[in-house]
Design a protein with these regions (language model features):
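Short, basic, helix/turn surface patches
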Residues: 131-133, 182-189, 255-262, 296-309
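N-terminal amphipathic alpha-helix/helix-capping segment at the start of soluble metabolic enzymes
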Residues: 7, 11-43
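Alpha-helix-loop-beta-strand connector modules within alpha/beta enzyme cores
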Residues: 88-100, 216-224, 295
Length: 319
């Protein structure tokens, strides 16, 4: 395969009917909801991957329905704790819907097992690896390279330099030579040519705002689709967790869903919005944000595409 990444400001990737990228206001934001996450109440055994199929299907269908209504494409973020579990989950998601899916785990062995299974059964056109990052070892990368998976999240986490420059350097040149290669080159060596650039959001007070700022820098330099799992910011905010425990659950939900708006307003093309259970509230929030951006960008072009809830303003609206 040609392992050279494409380059061009405002790159638009198309995967299983999902368009991602472009200029602000051009395409609707892509939302990825996580299913089978740790502690998910539809799972009966996280090690073997036993779960309630009926409830899982309802959650997936709810997200797909919200995607159809708003025009915001969706991705199923499949998390599995073990090799056995993630293979079961991917098999199930592959059967019940036709949407792209993320292969996600805290275990490198599980991620590889998921990638290999997707390759074996012909699901690579829908599969997105999560993720290629500075901690990935050679065996994992070599195994990924043996598959036909061509899309991956590229995590810009830099533990030694959490600045915008540090994140950009991790992608470009391995943090100015601290690592043998930059993550973009590592990804290309694995056969990846569709990059989803994750700005690696950290807790408030530890660089959360820097990650949002990195969105602008990445779009300006490379133009690859960019986003993050920014919903992790509220979950790592000690004060908010305590406030939630004190009986203010609604406030937590507002901050959790609202965090996605921040990512979109800073030029993000995708958000990993957290539990798929929140699809019915995450999609309207992001769709509204997309409409704000599309209106703001209407004078500059390009024209908004596939934003089902967006109506272009008439000249009179500007008076």
């Amino acid at each position: 395969r040609d392992r050279s990444p494409s380059r061009g400001l405002g790159d638009v990737y198309k995967r299983q009917g999902v368009k991602m990228g472009g200029q602000p206001g051009e395409y609707p934001t892509v939302l990825a909801g996580t299913i089978f996450y740790g502690g998910h109440n539809i799972i009966s055994d996280e090690l073997t991957g036993d779960f309630d199929k009926s409830r899982a299907e309802t959650l997936v269908n709810d997200m797909v329905e919200m995607s159809d209504v708003t025009g915001n494409p969706c991705i199923v973020q499949v998390f599995g704790q073990t090799e056995e579990a993630i293979v079961k989950y991917i098999e199930y998601i592959g059967d019940i819907c036709d949407k792209p899916f993320l292969i996600d785990s805290t275990s490198g062995d599980a991620r590889v097992a998921g990638a290999q299974y997707a390759d074996e059964v012909g699901l690579t056109e829908r599969a997105i690896y999560n993720s290629i990052n500075m901690a990935a070892d050679k065996s994992e990368l070599d195994a990924l390279a043996e598959t036909d998976i061509s899309a991956s999240i590229i995590l810009g986490f830099n533990p030694m330099n959490a600045t915008v420059d540090g994140k950009m350097a991790m992608w470009e040149n391995g943090d100015d030579g601290a690592y043998e290669k930059g993550l973009l080159e590592v990804a290309a060596d694995c056969g990846i040519d569709k990059f989803m650039m994750d700005t690696a959001v950290t807790p408030l007070g530890q660089g959360a705002g820097i990650a949002a700022k990195t969105t602008f820098a990445e779009k300006a330099k490379w133009g690859y689709p960019v986003g993050s799992g920014i919903h992790n910011v509220p979950s790592a905010w000690d004060w908010l967790r305590d406030y939630k425990k004190a009986g203010n659950k609604t406030a937590y939900t507002v901050c959790d869903i609202g965090a996605n708006i921040v990512q979109v307003m800073t030029g993000g093309d995708f958000v990993l919005f957290g539990p798929i259970d929140n699809a019915k509230i995450a999609f309207p929030a992001v769709a509204q944000t997309d409409m704000f951006i599309a209106e703001a960008a209407a004078d500059f072009g390009p024209e908004a595409v596939d934003c089902l809830l967006y109506t272009s303003p008439s000249p009179r609206d500007g008076l």
